[in-house]
UniProtKB/Swiss-Prot annotation:
This is ATP synthase subunit alpha. The record marks 362 as: Required for activity. Produces ATP from ADP in the presence of a proton gradient across the membrane. The alpha chain is a regulatory subunit. It is a peripheral membrane protein. Belongs to the ATPase alpha/beta chains family. It comes from Staphylococcus aureus (strain Newman). The gene is atpA.
Length: 502
């Protein structure tokens, strides 16, 4: 079969016309040194600060130290497969994490990869992990309450949407319990919760996830877990990943609650990275920018103005102290950044006062304007009553004779402490809180034995659910305080049926 010359030339012409020259230029470098999750790279002359670089085995790294002749990279994953002389290439992108509704109900690592064994997360939207905080003019004053369901907090140190409220205390004083209870109380409140576990044991993270699942709270919660077994870079970026996921909801007009549990471990991970990168150490061996580490994170919590949709991120950072020392470097830094703190005391915890909140050292600098009117009115004198009780309590230990007024103050104080106690995983709706605190401050509990206070409260709540629904609904729907007459009638009626212990 003869092939004509014209056919050959036409075939060649079509091939040449369809030919596309694909030439890609990749900036590459070479690993000079590797160890402890840090790689020293020669080359990569045009790499950006915070840019992702890719090693030959697919593991990613984050460019941190940009020096004259080399680049210090922290490795975001296992580094045992990387050796000296390996090739490293730029990706041209800064670190991003997946965001969106698809993440709700899932447990992910700080890179946004699922670790709960429930398959891939089908979202294509991403956001950069490092982002400038919302500007001054885009914000609005905190004016909406965020109910925690914990009497001692909602009455004494109220939290508003868009606030940063620090939870601080020694280990084993109930810090995580307060955070988890607050998440449980957001059910049916239209709030999306993000729980960031930093440097905790895998078993602890699993227990908290199960607690959330059993209470049905995973339906509106994302868990970002960087456990103690993970490399330091993942512990360092975990909070930023969490708040990035939250910002997606905030900018869509939704309300977000984010818990960082805890930032002490994040600061320790950052200290480790900084020392390995040979950055000069400062106080307590932390690098000079450890304040900025936390301020740029916590400033991303905000209440947006109405033009931007009125969304919010409320942050509850947790800090662990050593022997109650809140004057250490990281605690003082975070106290100065946040809008108040809830201080948990181990002495109170071990004496059975749980949550072990020290009312004297706990404060909410902006939450007062967000507190509902009903609570503001009934709990107005509570802090003062507690303070005077603590003072009189130490005075009464000397066993001197007490006048009638002092004795009544002490008795009221004992009942106040008892009312503010609360079991874990049992958040209380705000209308029930107002009811029991009203009964306390108006003297209705003065004739109830201290041992009966908890039972009195439980039975009052059950009784009110069926016999004082109008009263509860009025508080829930309007936020205002009903007539004193309605309260007095309801409480007196219940007291007739309540039997005191002998």
């Amino acid at each position: 079969m003869a092939i004509k010359a014209e056919e050959i030339s036409a075939l060649l012409r079509s091939q040449i016309e369809n030919y596309e020259s694909e030439m890609s230029v990749t900036d590459v470098g070479t690993v000079l040194q590797i160890g402890d999750g840090i790689a020293l790279i020669h080359g990569l002359n045009d790499v950006m600060a915070g840019e992702l670089v890719e090693f030959h085995n697919g593991v990613l790294g984050l460019a941190q130290n940009l020096e004259e002749s080399n680049v210090g990279v922290v490795i975001l994953g296992p580094y045992t497969g990387i050796t000296e002389g390996d090739e490293v290439k730029r990706t041209g992108r800064i670190m991003e994490v997946p965001v969106g509704e698809e993440l709700i109900g899932r447990v992910v690592n700080p890179l946004g990869q699922p670790i709960d064994g429930q398959g891939p997360i089908n979202t294509t939207k991403t956001r950069p992990v490092e982002k400038k905080a919302t500007g001054v003019m885009d914000r609005k004053s905190v004016d909406e309450p965020l109910q925690t369901g914990i009497k001692a907090i909602d009455a004494l140190v109220p939290i508003g949407r868009g606030q940063r409220e620090l939870i601080i205390g020694d280990r084993q004083t109930g810090k995580t319990t307060i955070a988890i209870d607050t998440i449980l109380n957001q059910k049916d409140q239209g709030t999306i919760c993000i729980y960031v576990a930093i440097g905790q044991k895998d078993s602890t993270v699993r227990a908290n996830v199960e607690k959330l699942r059993q209470a049905g709270a995973l339906d509106y919660t994302i868990v970002v877990a960087a456990s103690a077994s993970e490399p330091s870079p993942l512990l360092y970026i975990a909070p930023y990943s969490g708040v990035t996921m939250g910002e997606e909801f905030m900018f869509n007009g939704k309300h977000v609650l984010i818990v960082y549990d805890d930032l002490t471990k994040q600061a320790a991970a950052y200290r480790e990275l900084s020392l390995l990168l040979r950055r000069p150490p400062g106080r307590e061996a932390y690098p000079g920018d450890v304040f900025y580490l936390h301020s740029r994170l916590l400033e991303r919590a905000a209440k947006l103005n109405d033009d931007l949709g009125g969304g919010s991120i409320t942050a509850l950072p947790i800090i662990e102290t050593q022997a109650g020392d809140i004057s250490a470097y990281v605690p003082t830094n975070v106290i100065s950044i946040t809008d108040g703190q809830i201080f948990l005391q181990s002495d109170l915890f071990f004496s059975g006062v749980r949550p072990a909140i020290n009312a004297g050292q706990s404060v909410s600098r902006v939450g007062g304007s967000a507190q509902i009117n009903a609570m503001k009115k009934v709990a107005g004198t509570l802090r003062l009553d507690l303070a005077s009780y603590r003072e009189l309590e130490s005075f009464a230990q000397f066993g001197s004779d007490l006048d009638e007024f002092t004795a009544s103050k002490l008795e009221r104080g004992k009942r106040t402490v008892e009312v503010l106690k609360q079991d874990q995983n049992k958040p209380l709706p705000v209308e029930h809180q107002v009811l029991i605190i009203y009964a306390l401050t108006k003297g209705y509990l003065d004739d109830i034995p201290v041992v009966d206070i908890t039972r009195f409260e439980d039975e009052l709540n059950h009784w009110a659910e069926s016999n004082a629904t109008e009263l509860l609904n009025e508080i829930r729907e309007t936020g205002g305080l009903p007539d004193a007459e309605k309260f007095d009638t309801a409480i007196n009626e219940f007291k007739k049926s309540f039997s005191k212990s002998e």
